[in-house]
Amino acid sequence: MTASFSNFKRHLIAISVACCLTLISFSQNIVVAPYLQNGSPTNMTVMWETDVANDGYVDWGMTAATLTNTVTSASISGEGNNRIHTALITGLNDDTKYFYKVRTFTGIVSATYFFKTHPTKTSEKSLNIVAMSDMQRDGSNPNVFETIINSGIIPVANANYPNGMEDIEAILIPGDLVATGTYSSWRDTYFTPSVGITPYVPTYPVPGNHEYYGTGISLFLDYSDLPLNGSPSNPEEWWYKDISNLRIVGLNSNSPNADL
């Protein structure tokens, strides 16, 4: 083997490795599955998290086979290079079922989910709402939250409502979604166990004292998109939401020093 050919092989290997590293650096994964926030008769908010800073998209439509409408997300910084995405779907019909999926700039695509817009106030439609709290992980019973969803809420809805989870209008969580306000606590102990329901039903949480542990409530606010109709000095901490003829009021009852 000549010296020049040996050098050529080394350069070729180096180029191949560099190309592989470039491809790896631009790969993108969905690390928090899509979940719904802040719905209305005409809008729905979809949020999710990726591990690289690239554009995100929501494709949506009236059927799972016709996701022909697209919304581009806005995003904020998460842990490391992660981005927390928020996409607002507008121009919807009230009390109507839609389908959606999210995808990344690099072509990673989520499963296809559905949601239903809220009924109007004047419809005075009766509602089914799930209210639960204090699902922060207990080390001695770490799977309780997941069990409540997969062995409680979902089968009860499927057995008692004509359209299953589609007939649940909202999930209310008055605090203590997580044990500590860290990224791993949010991803591993709240979002992962709740993936059976949060992509389909909008969630309306308020912070408990556990959300303050470690980071204040910064991650609670980063992972939430709540009505901006409360106190201007504390947006998304006090709010109200009208669903049919029901008004839901969310109140943060914690002091700024709740991390005690």
Question: Model-found features: residue ranges?
Answer:
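N-terminal secretory signal peptides that target proteins for export/translocation
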Residues: 1-9
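Serine/threonine-rich, low-complexity intrinsically disordered segments
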Residues: 4, 24-26
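Residue-level detector of intrinsically disordered/flexible regions characterized by low predicted structural confidence
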Residues: 9-11, 103
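Bacterial N-terminal signal peptides
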Residues: 13-24
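Divalent metal-dependent phosphoesterase catalytic cores across multiple superfamilies
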Residues: 28-207, 211-237, 242, 258-260
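Residues within helix-turn-helix
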Residues: 254
